Amino acid sequence: MAKREYPLERTRNIGIMAHIDAGKTTTTERILYYTGKIHKIGETHDGASQMDFMEQEKERGITIQSAATTAVWHGFFDQFAKTPYRVNIIDTPGHVDFTIEVERALRVLDGAVAVLDGAAGVEPQTETVWRQATTYDVPRIVFVNKMDKLGADFAMSVESMHERLQVNAEAIQWPIGAEDEFEAVIDLITQEAYYPVDDLGEKWEPREIPAELKELAEEKRNTLIEAVADVDDDLMEKYLEGEDISVEELKAAIRRATLALQFYPVLAGSAYKDKGVQMMLDAVVDYLPGPLDVKPYVANDPKTGEEIDLIADDSKSFAALAFKIMTDPFVGRLTFMRVYTGTLQSGSYVQNTSSDTRERVGRLLQMHATSRTEIDEVFSGDIAAAIGLKNTTTGDSLTAVDHQLILESMEFPEPVIELAIEPKTKADQDKLSNAIQKLAEEDPSFRATTNPETGDTLIAGMGELQLDIMVDRMRREFNVEATVGAPQVAYREAFTQTVQARGYFKRQSGGKGQYGDVYIEFSPNEEGAGFEFEDAIVGGVVPREYIPSVEAGLKDALNAGPLAGFPLVDLKAKLYDGSYHDVDSSEAAFKIAASLALKEAAKTAGAVILEPIMAVDIVAPEDNLGDVMGHVSARRGMIEGQESRGPVLAVKAKVPLSEMFGYATTLRSATQGRGTFQMVFDHYEAVPKNIQEEIIKNSGKEA
């Protein structure tokens, strides 16, 4: 049996999260460089980044898949040389189309580093990932990056956290200089300044704080103490009694408050200019939790339903969550897992309690972004990748065969945008099916369906960029040649009234006939609740063996709604009466009867078409406020608020997705290229009557 290399209290599982272009991947690159994982620094804008390992990532300079890597930290001044820390890092995407990747990563992390652009502060996508991290109770530290950039303003960045995130966040460092003159960092806790002594920022030396900044540094230290004392009783007591607060006491209080999600330490630096990253790594080990510091993960015993706390302990039975599936060109299908308790050896069996299958782990790997180290055993609190788990998908629970548990699975959003994809040849058709299956395993927010009317394959996802990249991957990785249609909105249909309907199917044509007869009550379900089927049959008027066929018939019929053929969603169906024939009834007959009942109900159930409504953030110069307001109202949107962000205005609005196609060009020309916008799916809503009629007409169905 292998021996644990790093104790649990010296393990950190962290994510790097941010708005697109805040410098997240560059920050991760520097972490890998300073922890000795890479020997040459790669720049994102040169397409040489180690963590961005897919072709599309290198070309576009953005991170799409969260790459997991393991690093070892000895401390800024080698203070942990004898007892180093293992830091498992997940680099997550900042583009809204990939929030599913962020959500998955946060689910298995213990702590996170939020990276801000020092010239922009909190941006729309920062708010999105911050909310996601809050949902999963992930403690965070904040790294204000790009302090060398034109317009960088550290005080503004900290203030933007107060205003836009409404959180208790204060600086634990202060930059010396900004923009071209950013040269060093003051540690507010120790009241020392740190200056780099070489070009790559590997060696730094402590110096006295410059005289002109001494007063500011003391004032900021007091602000920090007050903010932490507000949420920490021990520190508050000392502070009120006017006692001196030592470096150790302040650091311990910051750690307690950060772990309790009541305080967020803010640091300054420039990853590109090699400043501040090692101090940020020290803050990761000083203030972010190890697996023993977070509240235990809760699992359920499938036999008794009892809740069981999973505490990181190697001596307990193995339990892990599969949080990502990837296809590696060299070793094939990889299952990334977070081990919550127990250990797992390569070659052993695990029980997938989500699919109720037993699987054998071929090999275990510790992953770097593009390379891997084979390991014999993975321990509790760790992240590793397994080869050989053929039936495991994202969100599945993996446990010891003799001690089965179900870990809470992940929920994935419904796609809001789709496009038709048509393979050029029969060979491409087969390759396309394989590509779709593999890509859907990797990304559960990517779906594929067949249009029942036209037979076209439709692929769907969270945004145009995501679908662009999926089509690109089909071409590059799976050699699929296909014609791709223009993006379409993923409309849905729903009933708004409760109705009862009969489905009666009888066919007699010599020999055995067909007979099925059902009475079903249909009623609207809550938004997002999906389809619910209730069997309310009394006295066997519909025999037991045909009831699953009724449910299956309804599920099939839901794929093409009555108005325009869009999926029918959020529906309750109660089977309450019916009849059967001893000889002629069959599963197929009841399936058809159920679909006929749904068709009948649609005539009087007040069916409507639903469209995805997006939460849109538009940032534009103040002079263009009138233009932006006009854009939103012309697109059937609702303005929800606006705020000033320095020289620009940020407008928040809710706008139907169908109205947002081509908006980037409109905004660019109205603002001379200075306006930007981001959007993320918010909810589905019924379309206005006139637009519903137009959609039905375009679908080729008659209203």
UniProtKB/Swiss-Prot annotation:
Described purpose of this protein according to its UniProt entry: Catalyzes the GTP-dependent ribosomal translocation step during translation elongation. During this step, the ribosome changes from the pre-translocational (PRE) to the post-translocational (POST) state as the newly formed A-site-bound peptidyl-tRNA and P-site-bound deacylated tRNA move to the P and E sites, respectively. Catalyzes the coordinated movement of the two tRNA molecules, the mRNA and conformational changes in the ribosome.
Designated name of the protein: Elongation factor G
A Pfam family per the record: EFG_III
Recorded family membership: Belongs to the TRAFAC class translation factor GTPase superfamily. Classic translation factor GTPase family. EF-G/EF-2 subfamily.
Keyword set, alphabetical order: Cytoplasm, Elongation factor, GTP-binding, Nucleotide-binding, Protein biosynthesis
GO MF: GTP binding; GTPase activity; translation elongation factor activity
HAMAP family on file: EF_G_EF_2_B
Subcellular location: Cytoplasm
Organism: Leuconostoc citreum (strain KM20)
InterPro entries in the cross-refs: EF-G-like_DII, EFG_II, EFG_III, EFG_III/V, EFG_IV, EFG_V, EFG_V-like, G_TR_CS
